[in-house]
Regions:
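Cyclophilin-like peptidyl-prolyl cis-trans isomerases
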Residues: 1-243
Length: 243
């Protein structure tokens, strides 16, 4: 599956970004599986039994649910009220929430968010990851989001689902979706790399696109609510020729 999908990491939650890079480079995820997949919720992967040895990465992570707003942060506001944050918008292609009252910022659980799972303890994340199949905004600031799927999300959506009565865990191991290869894109041989362009969310053109989605100009629409939900804003990505 990893050969078909590509995720992008953002330098918020930088410790988690470095953690998953270390795990990828030591081959931790190779041969593991997506074993818990809940329809309309998440696809979770990793070592379901917790038996695999971590060689170079940290055994546990300090939570980075949110962080202090960095100086000079480029934040493009969506421009509508939000039920989960004082303000929402985009940071370098990532949907994000912000509280200027608290001086905090975080990435949000829109579709395709890449995050680490954890137990009840705040700092119990280590290796288990999940990808959201639909928006799950109520999880914002409760788990650490540090990336998003930017290519191949259709393959994530096609992963075998588990039974709702078993918390989404797939009992039949033969139906698990294997992780054959999990790599940092920069480490992939040049001839095998994908070259993708993401829409510049700091641009005037993107602000115009936001407005066009907030009040759709097509003749089909008779009611225009002057509202846009954060997770309904498309973030265009396109494949470009190899350079």
């Amino acid at each position: 599956l990893a050969a078909r999908g590509l995720g992008r990491l953002k330098p918020l939650a930088q410790a988690h970004v470095e953690q998953v890079k270390l795990l990828a480079r030591e081959g931790y995820y190779d041969g593991l599986n997506f074993y818990r997949v809940v329809q309309g919720f998440v696809a979770q992967g990793g070592d379901e039994r917790g038996n695999k040895t971590i060689r170079t990465a940290a055994p546990f992570m300090q939570a980075e649910f949110d962080e202090r707003i960095p100086r000079g942060l480029d934040f493009t506001p969506l421009g509508n009220p939000d039920g989960y944050a004082d303000q929402v918008g985009f940071i370098n292609g990532f949907p994000a929430g912000m509280s200027r009252r608290e001086n905090r910022v975080w990435l949000t659980h829109c579709t395709g968010a890449f995050a680490f799972g954890r137990g009840n303890e705040r700092d119990s994340a280590a290796t288990e990851f999940y990808i959201t199949l639909q928006p799950q905004r109520y999880l914002d600031r409760n788990l650490t989001v540090f990336g998003r799927v930017i290519w191949g999300m259709e393959h994530v959506q096609a992963i075998m689902r588990g039974e709702p009565g078993n918390g989404g865990v797939i009992v039949d191991r033969s139906k698990w979706t294997p992780i054959r290869s999990f790599r940092v894109a920069a480490d992939v041989p040049v001839q095998d790399q994908l070259y993708l362009e993401t829409f510049n969310t700091n641009s005037e053109l993107f602000s115009e696109l936001i407005e066009a989605r907030r009040n759709r100009p097509e003749d089909f629409f008779y009611y225009r609510p002057d509202y846009l939900d954060l997770c309904q804003m498309p973030l265009p990505v396109r494949l470009t020729p190899n350079r």
